Amino acid sequence: MGTRHGNQLRMRITIGIIGALSLLAAREARADRRTMIRAYEFQTQPKGNLELELWNDVEAPRSAFSDSTIVTRVELEYGLTDRWDLALYHVFAQGGPQPNPEPFHFDSWRLEMRYRLAEKNEWPVDVMLYGELERPADFNEPFEVEEKLILEKDFGRLALVANLVGEQHLLRADLGRTWEVDFGVRYEVLPQLRVAAEFWTTHEFVGPDVSRNYYLGPSVSVATSKLWLQFGVGFGLDPGQDQQMLIRSVLGFNL
């Protein structure tokens, strides 16, 4: 008797949870929701939609976790059309090697644009273009530009995502350049819950010197009708690389 009552109670709880999640799914946010730590996915803001995003990165070197640099970004995104959006970042930073870490300070402005070349699943592989212009707060430093080719292929709830990235100092080739490749796998457990695994590598060239970094890590993304949260950790794979870990969280508010 007790076992039967317990089974009925568990069934009611399960039905209630499924019903609540289904209701949340029907009210999923019209937002640029992130799942990956590093890679951008095939999505832009809907036309006329405004979103506030708060990014927090912890860049931990191999020397000691206390030497980490914390980077905070405040971003406003706006959908110019359903396939083209614009974003403005204000970037702040603090921390670094002990015993003299940098205090909290304004680091840079960044202007970003993204454009989806077609609607989702119209092409064999979804393609999006990304461009970014950065103005460091130190006016003695040159502008920086960044380009991304963003590719995505969906297989039902599963999606494969790849980014090819280039970054340069504007009109200052002597200061070097950076190439990056990101590859991730995303799975939608529920419309409100996604999980992912991601690998990425960066190669920074300055004259004859090359600094290479390799990372692998998991991430999770949850969403409601008004906000979403992404959290992930990338672990350095090469014992000789400078950075040991990247921890990233992004909180988005649909305004």
Annotate each predicted stretch with a short phrase.
Residues 1-11:
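N-terminal secretory signal peptides that target proteins for export/translocation
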Residues 31-254:
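Transmembrane beta-barrel domains of Gram-negative outer membranes and organellar outer membranes
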